[in-house]
Amino acid sequence: MFNYFETTADLGVEAKGKSLEEAFKEGAKGLYNIMVDIDKVDKKEKIEFEITGEDLEELLYNFLNELLFYTDVENLVFNDFDVKIEKNDNGYRLKCTAYGEKINKEKHNIKEEVKAVTYHKMEIKQEEDGWKIRYIVDL
């Protein structure tokens, strides 16, 4: 599940999951639903990548910006993600498989361009019923 919250010139995303991995997955869905209707994205292509972060905030920032890199460079949009997060001596490592397809302007109904994810007001916290993340994107 994901929701949006308003900020002054940007857009905030709030995502929840029963696990940290599920919250990151929902956060990525929220990112792509800003850009396109993710229900219209088919799983024709997949990409796999691995990123690290010294803390969870850096991990989330690196994860979402890595996805944006694939959108900017490869013209891909995604609607599903397999996410695995491991804690290690240097912080955290995330492995992701993202599923989607090339952008098709007629099919995907382009809504907004997301320029970047920011650290501004980023939150990641464990709650009684799971995890919640919040982040803001520059449009």
Swiss-Prot record:
GO biological process per UniProt: tRNA splicing, via endonucleolytic cleavage and ligation
Keywords: Calcium, Metal-binding, tRNA processing
Superkingdom of origin organism: Archaea
Residues given in the record as Ca(2+) binding sites: 10, 138-139
Any one GO molecular function term: calcium ion binding
A Pfam cross-reference name: Archease
Family note: Belongs to the archease family.
Role this protein plays: Activates the tRNA-splicing ligase complex by facilitating the enzymatic turnover of catalytic subunit RtcB. Acts by promoting the guanylylation of RtcB, a key intermediate step in tRNA ligation. Can also alter the NTP specificity of RtcB such that ATP, dGTP or ITP is used efficiently.
HAMAP family in the record: Archease_arch (MF_01222)
Protein name in UniProt: Protein archease
Protein species of origin: Methanocaldococcus jannaschii (strain ATCC 43067 / DSM 2661 / JAL-1 / JCM 10045 / NBRC 100440)
Organism lineage: Archaea, Methanobacteriati, Methanobacteriota, Methanomada group, Methanococci
